[in-house]
């Protein structure tokens, strides 16, 4: 994913399918490293389904060589700019 596509899709909900057939990972695109192609996805957690009470989100770092396909899920609303700014603050402070 090039930097232009990353910026355009930032905050979009994506499903990543793996070359090795493991279960797909889903989440909102936070960033993509321009050198390695590593994706960073944010997966907000809901209280009903999580084993850890204090956790509100999960981050996935997915190496580009493990990715078979990236599928956008248009049925999910993208994160708004305020939410992205909050994650930016969390990850860069």
UniProtKB/Swiss-Prot annotation:
Keywords: mRNA processing, mRNA splicing. It comes from the Eukaryota. One of its GO terms (biological process) is spliceosomal snRNP assembly. One of its GO terms (molecular function) is RNA binding. Signal peptide: none annotated. Transmembrane segments: none annotated. The SMN complex catalyzes the assembly of small nuclear ribonucleoproteins (snRNPs), the building blocks of the spliceosome, and thereby plays an important role in the splicing of cellular pre-mRNAs. Most spliceosomal snRNPs contain a common set of Sm proteins smb1, smd1, smd2, smd3, sme1, smf1 and smg1 that assemble in a heptameric protein ring on the Sm site of the small nuclear RNA to form the core snRNP (Sm core). In the cytosol, the Sm proteins smd1, smd2, sme1, smf1 and smg1 (5Sm) are trapped in an inactive 6S pICln-Sm complex by the chaperone saf5. Part of the core SMN complex at least composed of smn1, yip11/gem2, gem6, gem7 and gem8. Interacts with gem7; the interaction is direct. This is Uncharacterized protein new12. The lineage of its organism: Eukaryota, Fungi, Dikarya, Ascomycota, Taphrinomycotina. The gene is gem6.
């Amino acid at each position: 994913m090039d930097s232009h596509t990353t910026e355009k899709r930032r905050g979009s909900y994506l499903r990543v399918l793996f070359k090795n057939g493991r279960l797909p990972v889903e989440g909102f695109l936070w960033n993509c490293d321009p050198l390695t192609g590593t994706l960073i996805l944010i997966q907000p957690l809901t209280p009903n389904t999580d084993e850890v009470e204090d956790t509100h989100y999960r981050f996935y770092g997915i190496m580009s060589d493990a990715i078979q396909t990236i599928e956008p899920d248009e049925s999910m609303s993208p994160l708004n700019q305020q939410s992205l700014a909050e994650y930016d603050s969390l990850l860069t402070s």
